[in-house]
A protein has these predicted regions:
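Acidic, low-complexity intrinsically disordered segments
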Residues: 1-212
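Flexible glycine/acidic-rich beta-alpha junction loops that bind and position SAM and/or redox cofactors
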Residues: 18, 75-77, 111-113, 229-246
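Short, Lys/Arg-enriched charge-dense amphipathic segments
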Residues: 68-76, 128-130, 234-236, 249-261
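A solvent-exposed, charged loop/short amphipathic helix patch at secondary-structure junctions
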Residues: 78-87, 197-198, 241-258
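Conserved alpha-helical substructure of the radical SAM core
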Residues: 200-232, 246-262
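Conserved small/polar residues in nucleotide/adenosyl-binding loops
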Residues: 266-268
Length: 268
């Protein structure tokens, strides 16, 4: 068991998926879940965006562990930030003491690994499932293993992440910060989805309840967040739709959608 007074470094290399934004001014949900894991265990950590790291990098020495999130898989030009590159990820790994555990996660990590990147280092792990759940398992067992979060963990880490350093220490908090909420994961076209898209790979959609989402947003608002985007959805009208498994074209369910749209300031 990792002692609660040890310090981790969380490097937010940003995520940009077809249904999820995380490049500034957005703060992505996956990095918040990772922070939520540490918040739950009262483990000290430092949050750093990759853009801040480029300007004034925090020390990689004397760390209990390092987590690098690299989740930008949608080609694009960004106005306020630049996602972490493979070369930068390599540099972070090579400059970290070999005895320090490093966890790298996100869809970019999966893509780089698929292209043949497979660094050999005893205490380095490339997460191919949920980075947050993989970290949680490591903190419990001191062993690396691919893990998926369950629904209770999803809710807990989302709420804790809303008040984490990914929000309170975010450089854009008192500026244009937009808080990306994961409404659901997956795609209703999980059987015949677009071949170029990663969303069908997540399988049958898994919803979060409107109450769960509203509570998360309330926590974020208390931390100073003013702008929220309802993300993670491949299609707003398929949120909690009827016949997702049985029908090719699910029937929209307007009531839960309406509950979400009562949030004061949102982006869809």
């Amino acid at each position: 068991m990792v002692e609660p007074n040890e310090t981790w470094l969380i490097i937010d290399g940003y995520e940009d998926e077809p249904a999820a934004f995380g490049v500034p001014p957005y703060v992505g949900f996956h990095v918040r879940y990772i922070c939520g894991v540490l918040e739950k265990r009262n483990i000290e950590y430092e949050y750093c965006t990759i853009d801040s790291f480029r300007i004034n990098s925090p020390s990689l020495e004397n760390r209990s562990g390092i987590v690098v999130l690299a989740g930008a898989v949608v080609p694009g030009k960004y106005l306020r930030g630049t996602p972490i590159s493979l070369n930068e990820t390599r540099d972070i790994i090579s400059n970290t003491p070999r005895e320090t555990p490093i966890l790298c996660g996100g869809w970019a990590i999966r893509g780089w690994r698929h292209q043949g990147w497979n660094p050999l280092q005893s205490n380095l792990f490339l997460a191919l499932q949920d980075t947050d759940a993989t970290l949680d398992h490591y903190l419990d067992s001191n062993t690396w293993k691919h893990q998926r979060r369950n629904s209770d963990q999803w809710t807990q880490w989302a709420h804790l992440g809303a008040a984490s350093k990914a929000v309170t220490d975010n450089p854009d908090l008192h500026g244009p910060l937009t808080y990306e909420v994961e409404v659901y994961q997956g795609c209703v076209r999980y059987k015949r989805g677009c071949k170029f898209c990663i969303e069908p790979k997540k399988g049958v959609p898994i919803w979060r309840s409107p109450e769960d989402i509203t509570q998360e947003v309330k926590i974020a608002h208390d931390m100073g967040v003013e702008h929220v985007r309802l993300g993670g959805m491949t299609d707003t009208y398929t949120y909690m739709a009827d016949g997702v498994v049985e029908l090719e074209y699910p029937i929209p369910n307007p009531e839960p959608i309406a509950k979400l749209l009562h949030l004061s300031l949102i982006h869809i």
